[in-house]
Amino acid sequence: NLIDFIWKGDGFPTRLPDSIIYDISDKNFDNLKNLEKIDKITVEMKNDVNSVAYLLHPKEQLRNDLIIYHNGHSEYDGGKKQIRFFLDKGYTVLVFSMPLTGMNNEPIIMLDGKKTKLEDHNQFKFLESDSFSPISYFVEPIAVSLNFIDKNFEYTNYHMIGISGGGWTAVIYPAIDQRISHAFSVAGSLPLELRTQERDAGDYEQTLPELYLIANYYDLYVLASFGTDKKLTQVFNYYDECC
């Protein structure tokens, strides 16, 4: 199944983040009027790839639900308009970016005896082995961060919103984690047979045969919306210049 493929038999992650820095300062978010504080969550993974997420707490918490906002390939503050919207509504917001983007690093590793900088998702195919799938880079940080939140907070529901690559993540992640109640995927995915234009081809993670032989996109849509109080909403804009 999906979890076995992603974590090669090790099971769904139960660990906690490698680092939590509480109440940090980031000038890029200074103008969010209902922002009380930011906690920085770092998850370290194989080949020195990391994930840095921000947990943004509202001054006035009017809702007891957590919003997971995934920027995709954009800079970590690229979704500030959407983040502001949810903060102003009184939600706590957990912000992620895709691997190798945003605040996440681009490590230099040894690959076939040469120093190689990881800066593109299509390089991940060279890291595959019988004991490791790079698909874990896309979903493990969310799982590990939610483990921390489970342990330290008592939110009623977790909802997820993502655009572009974040929209793809908002499809696959709820398919493997029942903790996500309602997911919104914006310009996030198309079944492979509908990708008739070059711009729709997608990166490594969008087209990996071994992954989609286990669960194709239709399967993922069902899995992401199956269960008590689970929903998946996909948004496609006809004149979308993003993706």
What does each of the following model-derived ranges do?
Residues 56, 65-72:
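The conserved beta1-alpha1 loop
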Residues 70-140:
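Cap/lid segment of the alpha/beta-hydrolase catalytic domain
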Residues 45, 69-74, 237:
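Glycine-rich His-Gly loop
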Residues 97, 184-187, 235:
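Alpha/beta-hydrolase-fold catalytic nucleophile elbow
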Residues 143-206:
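Primarily recognizes the serine-hydrolase "nucleophile elbow" in alpha/beta-hydrolase
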Residues 63-66, 89-92, 155-158, 177-182, ...:
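Loop/turn elements at helix/coil->beta-strand transitions in domains of secreted/extracellular proteins
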